[in-house]
A protein has these predicted regions:
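Short glycine-rich anion-binding loops that position phosphate/pyrophosphate groups of nucleotides
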Residues: 16, 87-90
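Glycine-rich nucleotide phosphate-binding loop and flanking beta-alpha elements
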Residues: 62, 89-93
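Short, hydrophobic beta-strand segments that form beta-sheet elements in well-ordered domains
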Residues: 80-87
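Phosphate-binding/catalytic loops
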Residues: 93-166
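Conserved active-site segments centered on acidic
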Residues: 2-73
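Residues at the C-termini of beta-strands that transition into short coil/loop
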Residues: 40, 86, 107-109
Length: 166
C-alpha cells in the first residue's frame, strides 16, 4: 500500500445509519490517512436524522453525507478496505470491486430499528457510534502499510469480533 490515503468503503443495507457513522468517524479520525465512503445495497435515500444528531452531539461533521447505492462505486475508486457493518449486507452477494480490496465484517446492531422514546433511540445511536469508533480506533493503530493482505484481513476480522468484549 502506498503513501496515498487508503480508500475505505462502509457497507450496509440502507446506508442511512451505521455505514454513515463509519464514514464520518473515519473521515474525521483518520487524519487524512484514509478517504472514507459509504453505500448500501438497498439505500433508503436519506440519512437517518438520529445519525446526524449523534454526529453533531459528539462534535463530528454531520454535513455532506448521503444515502446511496453501492452501484455508484462500480467504476471506482479502487477500494483498499471494505467493511460490512450489518449482517444482511454481509450475507448478500456484493459487487466485484475494482482492485483487490481487503474486506471484513464488523456487525453492529441496527440503531434505526430501535422503537421507543427519543432517549432510547439516542442511546441506540450512541451505542452504534461507540462500537464503530472502537473498531476504527483499533484499525487506526494497526501498521496497515506493513501487513500482508491475508494478515490484514485476519486482524480486521478480529477487531469486528473482539472490540466490544473489552
Amino acid at each position: 500500500m502506498s503513501d496515498q490515503p487508503l480508500n475505505v468503503l462502509f457497507l450496509c443495507t440502507g446506508n442511512s445509519a451505521r455505514s454513515i457513522l463509519g464514514e464520518a468517524i473515519l473521515s474525521h479520525d483518520g487524519e487524512g490517512r484514509f478517504k472514507a465512503y459509504s453505500a448500501g445495497s438497498n439505500p433508503t435515500g436519506k440519512v437517518n436524522p438520529w445519525a446526524v444528531h449523534t454526529l453533531k452531539t459528539l462534535g463530528y461533521p454531520a454535513e455532506g453525507y448521503a444515502s446511496k447505492s453501492w452501484s455508484e462505486f462500480a467504476d471506482g475508486p479502487e477500494f483498499d478496505l471494505i467493511f460490512t457493518v450489518c449482517d444482511s449486507a454481509a450475507a448478500e452477494t456484493c459487487p466485484v470491486w475494482p482492485g483487490r480490496p481487503t474486506s471484513a465484517h464488523w456487525g453492529i446492531p441496527d440503531p434505526a430499528a430501535v422503537e421507543g422514546s427519543d432517549a432510547e433511540k439516542a442511546a441506540a445511536f450512541l451505542d452504534a457510534f461507540r462500537m464503530l469508533k472502537r473498531r476504527i480506533d483499533l484499525m487506526l493503530a494497526l501498521p496497515i502499510a506493513s501487513l500482508e493482505q491475508i494478515a490484514l484481513r485476519e486482524k480486521l476480522q478480529a477487531i469486528g469480533h473482539e472490540a466490544d468484549k473489552q
